[in-house]
């Protein structure tokens, strides 16, 4: 490849000039003269079509000292091609001289998207609190890489007043910009913003409310739970309630005393009479999983309001530990409400899969009860799916009992294969026999393939 000799010479001169300026070998006036020549050479190279030289020149720009150099380069930024602007913007950002900020701000509004993206990235390095609104506006109005560049820069802006400005601008901003600023509060971990976001969680715009609740999950602490519970009680929509429940549960789990995690919810529950709000509080009790709330949920099962009963069952079904297992089995077995029976059965099966000190034999007996209570093939499939995570010979035998059932053989086979792989170390013969049986007899190509893969993997493990 031929290289422009003039540019080669210019670059060599640039290297010498940069070294001279950096080392202080020249007198002050001579140094200034050299800087001006160096900038001129860089700009000539950036205006050329020689990519190798441009890359070398940009690398040199990052090393050339002096705010005067930055200012001269920034001044010429609009006169360069889009590609050269992108390169120079990156170099200006790395230089860190704030004198380039006005030129970078102007470039944020360039027609060429690649220039806008480069300018947004550079603003993350050169910007301060005056850049907050510009970056939030860019993030709200853009998509893809441009939006990501604006967000990333907003999240990493430096300066002691940046966080304060973000919080001050939020209440006055348009909805889309509010959302971006609120998200930045979480990304920047601005814990002083809790009060602002509690207020924004009541905003008329759904997206603003959602963003506020999600960010509060990050920056709020247990001391804010009473206020968050009040937000849940007054939530405007089901989506608001869903987000509030997630936020409250996440923060409650940070309380070290497990039996005190639900205290803020339990404190207000007796005084809340409105059905939707009461159901929401029961829901969050299930997510928190504080055992001191179990008597409250058990009492709610006897409520005359069917919605309250349903919420209590759902809460027990969501419990993070196996404690409500017996209560759910009772409901699944004896409730006169079909929906309640199914909800309880599903919760019962879910809890059977949680870690416990229950003997393996007792667990299998409970799965058998669940199969007997399952009203249709769909619910029986859910039971077999839960059974597949139980690693015992009895579980393998139970799954095998449904291999000949036309409506269940696929789920039974999948469960048996999974269990066989899990118990092979203790029961190699039984596991191998089951896998071979499925491989030879199943009508499902998928099951046959799964069985063969497990057999192959077990064989390789034995060889090693």
Please report, for each region that a protein language model flagged, where it lies by residue.
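Bacterial N-terminal signal peptides that target proteins for export
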Residues: 1-10
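Bacterial N-terminal signal peptides
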Residues: 9-19
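Eukaryotic intrinsically disordered, low-complexity regulatory tails and linkers enriched
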Residues: 19-21, 464
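Structural detector for internal amphipathic alpha-helices that build alpha-solenoid repeat scaffolds
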Residues: 26-35, 44, 52-67, 71-78, ...
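HEAT/HEAT-like alpha-solenoid repeats
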Residues: 38, 228-232, 261-268, 332, ...
